[in-house]
Amino acid sequence: AHTGAQQVKANDAFICLRALFYVATGFLYRWQAIRKMLAFDATLIPQDFTQIHASDNSEPTVSPDLTDHVSSEAINHPEPPKSQPSESLESEAITRQCLIDYMLNEAGWEILHVKGDIQGGKAAIEVKIEGMNKQFHPSGIGYADYVLFSKGGKPLAVIEAKSTIHSPETGRKQAIEYADCLEKKHGVRPVIYYTNGYTTKVIDGMDYPDREVISFHSHDDLEQLIQKRGRADITHLMIDDEITNRPYQKTAIKSLVEWLNRKHRRGLLVLATGTGKTRVSISLCKLLDNNNWIKRVLFLADRTELVKQARKNFEKYLPSQTMTSLSDDTEPNKSARFVFSTYQTMINYINAEPVEFSIGHFDLIIIDEAHRSVFGKYGAIFQYFDSLLIGLTATPRAEIDKNTFQLLELENEPNFEYTYDEAIADGYLCPYRLKKCNSKMINRGIRYDDLSPEQREQLEKVWEYEKAMKGIPEDEE
């Protein structure tokens, strides 16, 4: 039952009803209660609605007529479907209504449901496009599935939709042709999307390879993307010596900037503990900001203490920038230039309804201690945001998991590495000396029952952290 104050739109209710129908039909078919998969028939929906009140009985009941036809064998060993309903997501129109419309709404777009209707700041459907290739469009006219317009009436993006049974690539060429025609007419090239509802790819006009995105960009995101097309490569590396004055720090920044100039969007720096990973990230942010590459930055760490420490350092060296912490601030400033958060807090934000941050809200995400467990447990963060992504770690290259390199789009090596041994040889770190110590805890071990409530809470936090770092599932002890 819907108990919230927000009214459910008729279209959303219709989509949910259809989805529920197919879930129920699938169960009934696999339990052999029905002989074939049924198609959803919208004509059976009553047009004269009366309000229905939920029953006070919380226990669901099942009709004996149904259970008598379902054998225990069918329930325990259900047969996979051998037929498909005639009405399904295979229809391009249904793909748009069930999947693409929903994604656009989540991104803040209001969809105009009258074909060809165009209003500033809204998503238009079946938009007439003139100047198409007459070899494939004899009249020279085509109709774009969606065009997203700026508040001033300029096309910010065009979307070509295909049904779920087709690859989104089948719509790529057509989407590009729509963009060509819109650019000739309006003087601005729209961002291009092509999608089948499950996989969506974007061509942003900045010469990056086509890339997959989880959803569509908001109105403000698209305006920022188009503005970024005017930025140049970073050729003058004005690195602030007050932040990073050591040679290896400057080399790390230069290596990463050169990598980004070559149209890569992800990178990894390996710097031994104590050699200034945070300072390097601050200096990199200042350099990218000065060259108009970034506006908003998200810094992620796995512990609140590390988030606080990072924010303190950023505030020290970039005092004029607005900063906030999602993990600590009572009322975080979500529009701040620099946002600091633990991974778990950010997961909560991107799972919130309504969505707290659009997919293009951040231009750069910095990951403190990038390794497999972070990508495994919190990978949804990096799938959700469409941004530059830089990983920092003290883990030596030889110990970095292959999947980490793949997720950062690297060929089994970081963009730059500065090892512990190099830091000692250069005089930036001192070698350690091992001193053997003993204690009651080492001799007797930790007995949970002997701990105070405060110690138990601390131990549980340590255990949760270790599980997260080692990728241990929640249900394993």
Regions found by a protein language model. Give the residues of each.
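Short, charged, amphipathic alpha-helical segments
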Residues: 11-15
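Conserved SAM-binding loop
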Residues: 245, 299, 367
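SF2 helicase catalytic motif II
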Residues: 355-391, 396
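ATP-dependent helicase/translocase motor core
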Residues: 8, 19-296, 305-321, 334-338, ...
